[in-house]
Structure formats: C-alpha cells, structure tokens
Amino acid sequence: MFDDLPPLSHQEQQRAVEEIQKLMAEGMSTAQAIKIIAEKIRAEHKAQSAE
C-alpha cells in the first residue's frame, strides 16, 4: 500500500501526521484518514514529477 509513496522529509511527515489527526478528530477512521493523506501525497509528488 505504501510502496509507491515518495520519501518524505521529517517536516513533511509531521505535516501528514497532523492532517491525519485532524481528519480523525472530525470523526474519520484512522484507515480512511491515512488513505486520503497518502493519496494526496502521491498526487502532489506526481504533479511535481511532471513539471
């Protein structure tokens, strides 16, 4: 599931954790929150790679 995630800096990892925690605080399951943030990271990385 996470094999295609790009390497993240500590700051990027921290930001991802904070976003996941925010989604969970809004009532989302942990798995769903992780899935959403992972997809967001993949999309951002793909967009940067295309430039």
Curated annotation (Swiss-Prot):
Pfam families hit by this protein: UPF0181 (PF03701)
InterPro entries xrefs: UPF0181 (IPR005371)
Family indicated by similarity: Belongs to the UPF0181 family.
Family matches, as HAMAP family: UPF0181
Record-given protein name: UPF0181 protein VVA0806
Organism: Vibrio vulnificus (strain YJ016)
Lineage: Bacteria, Pseudomonadati, Pseudomonadota, Gammaproteobacteria, Vibrionales
